[in-house]
Amino acid sequence: ACKLGHNYSASDSLFFSNCQGENGEACAIFAGPYTVTHHKSTLLIAGMFSFMNAGSGSNQSNHMYKLGPIHQGTLERGAKTTSDSYILWPARVGAFSLVMGRHVNHSDTSNLPFSNLIEQNNTTYLVPGVNLRSVGTIRDAQKWPKRDQRTDTNKLDFINYNLLSPYTVQKMFKGRETLKNLRYASGELSDIYSFHSAKIRNSALVKGIGFYETAIHKFLGNSVIKRLEGIDFRTNEEIRARLKPDTSIGSGEWVDISGLIAPKSEIDALIDGIESGTVNRLKYINAEFERMHQNYYTYEWTWAYDKLEEFYGINPEKITAEDIIHIVEKWKEAVVGLDRMVYEDAKKEFSLASMTGFGADGSRLEKELDFEQVRGDFESNPFVTAVLKHIEVKT
């Protein structure tokens, strides 16, 4: 279900399921699932991408005019580029981040996912975590499964669509720690903080810590609820027994191998098997990927269980019903808080300034009526009603 057409030019590149390439150009790219580029002026070169949307005129350079075109870069899953954006490789952009402007200072924001990278006067400004409240990010996560064009019941690419997973949440843990360390090192009253070659404004840093903490509360709370739901517990011992993971697989670092999210230990074991010759057929490799994909939630719980003590300061082996209630209350606050932020973000699309008429002329009232006929009014928008329903259910 990969579509390349309308004079799309690609060389030395690999495209996976549900990629779309039209009009533009690709050279030496690894295009994971849902890498989409539609514009004639867009060049993707020497990079790894997945769940990515390239704006018109987006391009990168893998050549610094010294030792030849030897550099490469990565836009992690869900990254987007705006029109006329530019990145000088080597660089790495964190998951679900937005790149706007020209970036030449080789930033690595992989541990600050859901961020905006904005260029002002040749300087990269980083706004960490802000896309967690973006209606665009939520819409993207909802649309990808719906746009899966594969018709065969036996799907060869194992794709995990989860926005919050051990892969992204482990980066939030690191990002939260990084931001706290920056604030400690430079002082709470600094206007600007320096991170690698990027700048972070004070207000953005403080909000970023809050965004990451909210998302971590949401993920860990959700994991605990899923683990305990549907069972009546009479004692704390029963709760502790149920919380114990079913396997040790899942602890430690997780990786996203272009769609499949899995523990790094399992990927390393597969690589060792290939190198030693014990895994010597493509069908065996695919069977391993399928096993990891099917056991995702089992492995995810092992990871989440390990994080309970680090984040909440609660030893899972001594956890009580009161502790669970505390975690669930924090989870509810996080879910409803994020929903309200997404709701407010969606509201901007329906502000008077954003309302455009669809004719050649017309008064302000006619423009508003035009907009309403085409887009509907705010409160009846399907996405908005879904968010409001979600808030109502959770409260």
Task: Go through the PLM ranges and name each one.
Residues 110-395:
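Terminal amphipathic alpha-helical/low-complexity segments used for targeting or macromolecular assembly
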Residues 3-184:
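Glycine-rich hexapeptide-repeat left-handed beta-helix
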